[in-house]
Amino acid sequence: MVKLTKRIGGLVLRLAAFGAALAALIVMITSRERASFLAISLEAKYTDMAAFKYFVIANAVVSVYSFLVLFLPKESLLWKFVVVLDLVMTMLLTSSLSAALAVAQVGKKGNANAGWLPICGQVPKFCDQITGALIAGFVALVLYVLLLLYSLHAVVDPFLLQKS
Amino acid sequence: MVKLTKRIGGLVLRLAAFGAALAALIVMITSRERASFLAISLEAKYTDMAAFKYFVIANAVVSVYSFLVLFLPKESLLWKFVVVLDLVMTMLLTSSLSAALAVAQVGKKGNANAGWLPICGQVPKFCDQITGALIAGFVALVLYVLLLLYSLHAVVDPFLLQKS
């Protein structure tokens, strides 16, 4: 019975991670706002920033991976390799979220030392939607860290909870 | 004999990771250049960018952790917990390197969509030293990923190399 609940627990975490990564992807891709600035009409979209494009690619990869792993048979030896792939996905989410956050922070506050003005004053809705995508990306990351700790706990017992 | 070589291998990886994280920290902290721009004298330093400050803090944490773990007794049960801490350090290095890279990329190329001009034209030596710090940070990250795979391999055998 315990094994069954553990297995279902793992699948639920993976399903939630799939949902969060997909949401982050969709919210980021659909973030766009038109604004006029000194009589010039501008449109802000996620493709304007390399870090946001990286965020989209990373969450797309994680979404596909999370979906495929749901169909891996229980007895498959590949589950041993899934631990390493979970690690890779966790690093990909960590990296893309951090890069997008760093650039979003500059977009929100600007950087006086570098002479970069903030942009969120002109395109507030765009910035709010980017924030939403980053939150969804953070949820996906937390779920993947839980998945990793869950896999590590099953094999390494790092918190010494199992009676030896 | 195999166990001894494995143990020494682990310690050498940790020592190298300690050296790389410390180098990244020192190179980033000492990066500074004075430049004059439209008769204004400016000094570029790592504290100008939040992402670079984050990079310094992360590599400082990893350096201290890597140094302390070197003194952990072989038989200690804490080694089981070190796998989780190695994961945390790997994520910290991934995150801080990605954030610093995202901002450095904007510093090097600017971003026309956001109206941000590149800065490396005015402070080329500063940018070169930042690049050096990011390379050292990347080496520390690669070493930590190897350490993680090494720990996972010892307990999970994800590449199914051990004869069952």
Curated annotation (Swiss-Prot), chains A, B:
InterPro entries according to UniProt: CASP/CASPL (IPR006459), CASP_dom (IPR006702), CASPL (IPR044173)
Topological domain spans for side Extracellular: 29-51, 102-129
Transmembrane segments: 8-28, 52-72, 81-101, 130-150
Residues exposed to the Cytoplasmic side: 1-7, 73-80, 151-164
Keywords: Cell membrane, Membrane, Transmembrane, Transmembrane helix
Family: Belongs to the Casparian strip membrane proteins (CASP) family.
Protein name in the entry: CASP-like protein 1C1
